[in-house]
Curated annotation (Swiss-Prot):
UniProt KW ATP-binding keyword: yes
Primary role: Part of the RFC clamp loader complex which loads the PCNA sliding clamp onto DNA.
Naturally occurring in which organism (per UniProt): Methanothrix thermoacetophila (strain DSM 6194 / JCM 14653 / NBRC 101360 / PT)
Name of the protein this chain belongs to: Replication factor C large subunit
Family: Belongs to the activator 1 small subunits family. RfcL subfamily.
Gene3D superfamilies: 1.10.8.60, P-loop containing nucleotide triphosphate hydrolases (3.40.50.300)
Gene: rfcL
Keyword Nucleotide-binding: yes
GO BP terms, alphabetized: DNA replication
Keywords: ATP-binding, DNA replication, Nucleotide-binding
Quaternary data: Heteromultimer composed of small subunits (RfcS) and large subunits (RfcL).
UniProt GO molecular function: ATP binding; ATP hydrolysis activity; DNA clamp loader activity
């Protein structure tokens, strides 16, 4: 399943938001390549995460009709690999004569065993390049100085919340989702200028819904540096278990929510033995969460949190880098899709509970199937539906049918007839009572006099003259 961040990635530079100056510099550099050799062979696109640096590089290749090759931080970038892959790509055009753009992502993370000699190899590639090269980094000054001197920096800045909100509304329209302006603006404001994070937050809140309200938004006022996606990065790619745990301290997600995120994305990052050990840690964490629910002892959260973060990080000895397309829990999507059905179910359970003098939870767990069986019976169905005051959607849910079926519609109509008959009977009884109450005083006096005379005659003792 393609994430929305990938699905709505810009296809050309006009789609890059909030960084018009950077886009202009990119276009000018590309046109210089088209006319011959530019002043610099390589650009460094730098700025905060999620502001469109990689998207701009890919959009440039698309707009200029260039081929491209991308080497990101998830790949091993030793001197030998860079020499064998990026080297030839930067010196030779395609068979059709098109230029080839070489993109190296996370250039400020060239360190460690896997990237040994990578910076020096990239510098040699740039010096010998006859094709355009782009380096992408978050921190400009984390790139080694010889590399910086061989390139020209192009800065990307954080994107304004209004600009982000405008794009989020367009995405909602494309997905057929009606969105409250406050909900979209809340996501945009909480993103801290990170467009990718905002789109991911929108997807987590809105996927499976038809109407997005403010209360549906999963994000809340929290440190934007501690978004769920950055926490997942720390868990799966952090230096150690402690950093994985500490990344959750400012996260506004309970362990019961966080475990669903990790469970969904664990198979994306880990494989084979690591995956099995990772799920074992999640299983143990879930045991502690169960104890929290049963005992209401929230101090046990700390053990669950460590197992699902530090424990999951500890099962892997690899140091992973680069961008991973994390996805929101599929469980939440299913809950969103069944929200209306659950609402109808709970409404029916409340009516049954009130009629039977039991709790709603008991009615929901024990009586729904029983009432459904009564509704399916021709003898009792209409009477039960009328007694409980069920609407057509509740009848359909309890009988396991669609509201549009003739059987459900007839049952609902019969129940309505019973209800109307009872209402008419109640009105008749009420009218009779009112008639008695508004009877004329002289009529009452004559009636009472007549009744009194009859009573006196009945109570009078018989005499001899009666025989």
């Amino acid at each position: 399943m393609t994430s929305w961040a990938e699905k709505y990635r810009p296809k050309n530079l006009d789609g890059i938001l909030g960084n018009a100056k950077a886009v202009s510099e990119l276009r000018a550099w590309a046109m210089a390549w088209e006319k011959g050799r530019p002043e610099v062979k390589c650009l460094i696109l730098y700025g905060p995460p999620g502001v469109g640096k990689t998207s701009a590089a890919l959009a440039l290749a698309s707009e200029m009709d260039w081929d491209y090759i991308e080497l990101n931080a998830s790949d091993q970038r030793t001197a030998e690999i860079i020499k064998s892959i990026a080297g030839p790509a930067s010196q030779v055009s395609t068979f059709s004569g098109r230029r080839r753009l070489v993109i190296l992502d996370e250039a400020d993370n060239l360190h460690g065993t896997y990237d040994r000699g990578g910076a020096a190899a990239i510098l040699r590639v740039i010096k010998n390049a006859t094709q355009p090269v782009i380096l992408i980094a978050n921190e400009y000054y984390n790139i080694e100085k010889p590399l910086r001197d061989a390139c020209r920096g192009v800065q990307f800045r954080s994107i304004r919340a209004q600009t982000i909100a405008s794009l989020l509304r367009e995405i909602c329209r494309s997905e057929g989702i009606e969105c409250e302006p406050e909900a979209v603006m809340h996501i945009a404001a909480m993103s801290g200028g990170d467009l990718r994070s905002a789109i991911n937050d929108l997807e987590a809140a809105a996927r499976g819904l038809k109407h997005l309200r403010l209360e549906d938004v999963a994000t809340s006022e929290r440190d934007v540096k501690a978004s769920i996606f950055r926490v997942l990065d720390s868990i799966f790619k952090g230096e150690d278990s402690r950093s994985a745990l500490e990344a959750t301290y400012q996260l506004d997600e309970s362990p019961e929510d966080l475990i669903h995120w990790i469970d969904e994305n664990l198979p994306i990052v880990y494989k084979d033995r690591e995956l099995a050990k990772g799920f074992e840690c999640l299983s143990r964490a879930d045991i502690f969460l169960g104890r929290v629910r049963r005992r209401q002892n929230y101090t046990l959260w700390r053990y669950a949190a460590f197992l699902m973060t530090g424990g999951v990080r500890a099962v892997s000895s690899k140091v992973r880098r680069g961008y991973t397309q994390f996805r929101p829990p599929s469980l939440w999507k299913r809950l969103g899709q069944t929200r209306k059905a659950r609402s109808v179910r709970d409404s029916a359970a409340r009516k049954i509970a009130a009629h039977c003098h039991v709790s709603t939870s008991y009615a929901r767990s024990e009586l729904l199937n029983f009432v459904g069986a009564l509704l399916r019976s021709k003898k009792t169905g209409a009477a039960v539906a009328a007694s409980l005051g069920l609407n057509i959607e509740e009848i359909a849910l309890l009988t396991g049918s669609s509201p549009t079926t003739k059987k459900v519609q007839k049952l609902f109509e019969d129940a309505q007839k019973i209800i109307e008959a009872e209402q008419i009977a109640m009105i008749d009884r009420g009218l009779k009572i009112v008639d008695r109450e508004i009877e004329k005083p002289e009529d009452k006096a004559m009636k009472y006099a007549s009744v009194s005379k009859e009573i006196v005659q009945e109570k009078r003792q018989r005499s001899l003259f009666d025989f």
